[in-house]
Amino acid sequence: MGRKKKLPTGVSSGVSHASSAPKSVGGCCVPLGLPQPLLLEEKKFLLAVERGDMPNVRRILQKALRHQHININCMDPLGRRALTLAIDNENLEMVELLVVMGVETKDALLHAINAEFVEAVELLLEHEELIYKEGEPYSWQKVDINTAMFAPDITPLMLAAHKNNFEILRILLDRGAAVPVPHDIRCGCEECVRLTAEDSLRHSLSRVNIYRALCSPSLICLTSNDPIITAFQLSWELRNLALTEQECKSEYMDLRRQCQKFAVDLLDQTRTSNELAIILNYDPQMSSYEPGDRMSLTRLVQAISYKQKKFVAHSNIQQLLSSIWYDGLPGFRRKSIVDKVICIAQVAVLFPLYCLIYMCAPNCRTGQLMRKPFMKFLIHASSYLFFLFILILVSQRADDDFVRIFGTTRMKKELAEQELRQRGQTPSKLELIVVMYVIGFVWEEVQEIFAVGMKSYLRNMWNFIDFLRNSLYVSVMCLRAFAYIQQATEIARDPQMAYIPREKWHDFDPQLIAEGLFAAANVFSALKLVHLFSINPHLGPLQISLGRMVIDIVKFFFIYTLVLFAFACGLNQLLWYFAALEKSKCYVLPGGEADWGSHGDSCMKWRRFGNLFESSQSLFWASFGMVGLDDFELSGIKSYTRFWGLLMFGSYSVINVIVLLNLLIAMMSNSYAMIDEHSDTEWKFARTKLWMSYFEDSATLPPPFNVLPSVKWVIRIFRKSSKTIDRQRSKKRKEQEQFSEYDNIMRSLVWRYVAAMHRKFENNPVSEDDINEVKSEINTMRYEMLEIFENSGMDVSSANKKERQPRPRRIKVWERRLMKGFQVAPVQNGCELDAFGNVNGQGEMQEIKVESIPSKPAKETAKERFQRVARTVLLQSTTHKWNVVLRAAKDSQIGRCTKNERKSLQNLGRAIEEAKRLIMLNPGCPSGRESPIRIEFEDEKTSTLLELLNQISAEISDSEKPKIRPIWRPPLKTVPARAMAANNTRSLTAPELKISRKSSPAPTPTPTPGVSHTALSQFRNRELPLCPSKLIANSAPSAPTAPPKKSAPTAPTPTYKPTTHAPFSVEGGNRENTRASDGVRSDNSNFDIHVVDLDEKGGHLGRDNVSDISSIASTSPQRPKHRN
């Protein structure tokens, strides 16, 4: 055979795992790209890396690089490579060794970042910089997408941001790494269109990953000059994304909460009022804040605009706002309730006097007091309460009652004449006061729009109520003016028109319409009073809940209206004719007037279902019990029609009354529960918005005093230009100083935040990962010490006498899966059936296989074509496949073993029979003796079975020859020839079960060219791991009269096909059959495992028979030396 072709990845073509077709192992079909079955040497390699065995890893890599017999870039069943295992264990020396020895890094950099292994990240970044070529993808981009642990769009910087690791982010940013800028979700550029067309899911997830990186607190701290405003903007942008892209709403909302929490955490680091004031008043467009100046609170206004409720409700900010709110009234919060009520009542009664004083002398003491936020609030609230009082007087016609009680005789006569003259009346004195208030309200809203802008104005829901209220009042004023002109014209033509009673007016007379709009405006005016409840801690949460419930009512109204309209259409179509009959009975008077006296019932019933609008009204009032079954007793109605009408009405009552109304109640209860859960935050946020409206430099005078000219208004006109010039000069002079001061404070906050994060991390309790890390470091140090001692000529065999170290459950599970050949692939459920429906013609399952669909032959008859089509349809049917599985399982609860497991099953049976036979040889053997054989790194089932059989054999041997003391043989230790002879003699009478390498009786090895005699003599009797099959087949003792077994034949050269590779089937061959040129030799069940060491010239020095997989972790074989 010629030499095998070497692949670029360091794997020979004969053992390449990247085959052109999926491989099937143990009934599993492994798809392309997924981890392929491993060779035994590859399993040993991964196991040595996981346990930190540097010497053996170094030897395996050297041998692999010279002979190309294994794939050093192999993966375990879960897709983890050697570098990944070393990174998970945070073994920097192992990572350096693997990188230096040429192991492909693949996505190891991402794994190191994910594990937050900073040293490995630095090493892998340097390695990536060395091997990267311009125009080619990076190492982590070359990983197969089927086995990649990370999404293709993930970059090192993005992953570090996801982990929020400040140190790794700093390293990457210092190197010039950058996070890609996300496109707008509505972006229509060529790149976005192409990515969406290729894979819309991947494009959407890529946007989520980018925003997850951008929301990292550490990344914001490192890249933003103003982390607080950056967090605000990201939070608001994520809110818009959540509303636009509903599919990823939960992810975006989680990121939004993360940004909000980061802003609050930064705010936690403020320590003085000066720091807090500078942060909240920073505005690049205005002059810097100085202690004692009026606070603009620009940052707080932005927080309210971005709805940062937790930031606004923070205790630091609330304390500062409280001090500003009650400025000018020292000690007010410490007063008793009675004193507070007296103080507020005094301001409420004297508010006109305060307003007049401010209009005349705005800079006096009283004028300065009125500019304080709390006093301004009390003045405005008192003025609004007085307006509501005027509305009550107008609605009750109090001016007429006052004339009747306190008026003179002439005034009473004029009042009587006005009552008779109902048309063409001018507004009363109280109505004129209302007009002045309305003008003041409109002017106040106009000033607010100019001050804050239209967008900010529309964000406040209470402004909508103000706008609606003002619109209604203005409409009333216009209609009253139009009605007065119209009526005055009519009276001028006919004076008797002024005495027409109101019941004779037209239905849509302008004055009647104005009165209706005036009543609606009064309702909104009274509701605006709820806004003042935000000040009170008890009524504030109720006011917020009311706002949420209004939103629920609006959402519920759409469904309710749909159901109402549907049933109204049906009932109107069914009962319109009979309603028309009732209407004809009602309107029987001359002129088409309704006869309410004689036919009052008909006049009521026809309106119920006379048209679509009346039907809708009837169903609406039916929700409140205002419509009954009597309304269906119409003239001439038939029983069938009446039945269908009642059935539809009953269905509407069930759906709308029982279901939908209860749904509305549940929605409102849920809204209140949400507010109650966060009542403190919600109330403080609502109260802060109310406070901020009085902190602003808005109109100090309330309506209607704000429309009257004052001294301050005149002074402001003449000083406007000079103030503008002073402000610009101040801005230019202090802009740099302001930025420097704010920047220093923000850096201090960031430093404190990072330091607090590190302290919190250091104070975390010790976890299981920390303990495992310590164990791994101790294990690695043990292997290094053993190698040093062995290279120094010391005997380290006694190190193997130590009992097996307990391993974490995670490591046990990983080792079991690795050695068992575990694969993440579906099992093919199918089998070959004979004509009688038996599996493989034997009535039992040998191996589950999928029968292939028959191919079309070159020439076939019509009959053959029909048979082929019918068989294809049968094989593709689900029923056939399920029946195949059922026949294969034979109605068994556990199924049958596969072909690869049959030999293990037979060996288990033989082991049970052999144990019984050994016990029957000497039933009185003592108990409690332990086996001198130690099996390491086997699965629990195999280790327990071997230990049990060894104990039985040892007890029988000790009971028959008590004077002969058994020799304990540690693993990887040379067994003397004299001990072997004693054992062979003992096996003739009472066989002792040993698990060791089979060798010829001759103690002296036969010279072999190219093989170190010293190495063979030193390691010829090292114990090898055996599975139960090899134990029974080769090492189990037989009866005294049974003929001795022949030695095992020499194993052929391996082909390394995973389909014939059986893990755990390891057996030592005869010494004369070993060759230094063979690394591993195997057949279906036997292996000879060797680790070849090379001298400096590349020649063979010797061959170490590694005992088992445990030798990698328990000790390191010494490099054999030449003997003279």
Curated annotation (Swiss-Prot):
Residues 1-24, 978-1013, 1031-1124 are annotated as: Disordered. Residues 362-373, 453-512, 570-645 are extracellular. GO terms for cellular component: cation channel complex; dendrite; inaD signaling complex; membrane; plasma membrane; rhabdomere; rhabdomere microvillus membrane. Its main location: membrane. PROSITE patterns: ANK_REP_REGION (PS50297), ANK_REPEAT (PS50088). Changing W713G: Disrupts Ca(2+) inflow through the channel. Calmodulin has little effect on Ca(2+) flow. It comes from the Eukaryota. It is a multi-pass membrane protein. Forms heteromultimers with Trpgamma and, to a lower extent, with trp. Interacts with Fkbp59 in vivo and is found in the inaD signaling complex. This is Transient-receptor-potential-like protein. The gene is trpl.
